[in-house]
Amino acid sequence: MIKIPKIGFVSLGCPKNLVDSERIITKLKAEGYDLVDSYDNADMVIVNTCGFLNSAIDESLEVIGEAIAENGKVLVTGCLGNKADLIKEKHPEVLSITGPQDYENLIEAVHTHAPIFANDFVSLVPPQGIKLTPRHYSYLKISEGCNNTCTFCIIPDIRGKLKSRSIDNIMKEAEKLKNAGVKELLVISQDTSAYGVDIKYKSGIWNNKEYQSNIIDLATALGDLDMWTRLHYVYPYPHVDKIVPLMAQGKILPYLDVSLQHSSPEVLKRMKRPAHTQKTLDRINKWRDICPDITISSTFIVGFPGETEADFKHLLDFAEKAQLDRVGCFKYSEVEGAKANQFDNLIFVATGILHTQDIKPEKSLKELSADKFIELFKANTIFPALVAKHFIPKLVKDTNLYSQLFLRVLVVSLIINLVVLIINFLLITFR
């Protein structure tokens, strides 16, 4: 009997990395490899790493070490794969190191260290590929890389410049996901609103209609699938205004995950972020005028090098005016290779500006500013995050935010219909 190699797989990092893991696993399954959920039963382990924040690098190195200790045969891929010298220095036992989206060389390494009898098992793989998300939703990655040059970020160095997929290619994948029973699509990329810029918005045919490879046509086409479509990682560019009417019409979910990071013009300038605070506020108000049910989420960085008390107050004032429905607030963390590391590392306290070396370790100024920002949002985020009409708001803990912060999310409309049915039954019964 031919032994089929068993592969253990660890996926770290963001949703974009998870999609990479899905593609790798789909390829392995198509070749007949078994996937197992423990180190002990695996002939080899693949670790798909994250290499963005220093904390993510530490976690990736720790997991690689754990896999080596528990199994011994380890292949490393993903964002940290671009720092092969660092991995080899820490873990010389690693068998192979490949970077993000380097699927061909990774699979070749798998063949080398866990060879399999040549065969074609494509028929055993579902048309939509192997998915690591729950069955009801799936990530839909529309591009790789990024053209922005934010000073706190090294994504372009890790994943390269923007590389958009053609719109017909994306729609074919979306259709396969729908046919597989997926109800919700989470559209992701590094910069969703820049989709198609690099391929000059080239046209594609789907469902006998011509569409351009831009975010507006893509949202329109996805809206015709009769699925929930949610847009993530959107920059507040002017053309995003054209997407909001689709939300008002019920074509896609009235939800925008908008990358803001800060509001102070000085901080944004140092971050090299393409944003103008007043225009952003005007745009948010315009979106709400067009689609009153829209839910807007964002993330912010506090304690960025050079941030002053005035800058932080500007951010608090912006938060009060914007009244965002959902926020993630993060303390600035140095990223190896980021240009922001060269800035004067100044952050404020209520009494003035101090250098980080003057901060008491038990309560850093970054934590103070983050705590203050979160306190403001505690009063402003307990609102129904409407993604469709007739939903019941329910309080849940959101692991993406501070543990003390609770947000309202929505329970599917079937529940409210059930409640109404029960109430009507009781009224009729006891009338």
UniProtKB/Swiss-Prot annotation:
Binding-site positions, [4Fe-4S] cluster 2: 146, 150, 153
Family that this chain belongs to: Belongs to the methylthiotransferase family. RimO subfamily.
Enzyme class: transferase
Protein name: Ribosomal protein uS12 methylthiotransferase RimO
Co-factor note (free text): Binds 2 [4Fe-4S] clusters. One cluster is coordinated with 3 cysteines and an exchangeable S-adenosyl-L-methionine.
Known catalytic reactions: L-aspartate(89)-[ribosomal protein uS12]-hydrogen + (sulfur carrier)-SH + AH2 + 2 S-adenosyl-L-methionine = 3-methylsulfanyl-L-aspartate(89)-[ribosomal protein uS12]-hydrogen + (sulfur carrier)-H + 5'-deoxyadenosine + L-methionine + A + S-adenosyl-L-homocysteine + 2 H(+)
Ligase among keywords: no
Gene name in the database record: rimO
PANTHER family for the chain: RIBOSOMAL PROTEIN S12 METHYLTHIOTRANSFERASE RIMO, RIBOSOMAL PROTEIN US12 METHYLTHIOTRANSFERASE RIMO
GO annotation, cellular component aspect: cytosol
Entry keyword set: 4Fe-4S, Cytoplasm, Iron, Iron-sulfur, Metal-binding, S-adenosyl-L-methionine, Transferase
HAMAP family associated with the record: MTTase_RimO
Domain annotation MTTase N-terminal: ranges: 5-115
GO biological process: tRNA modification
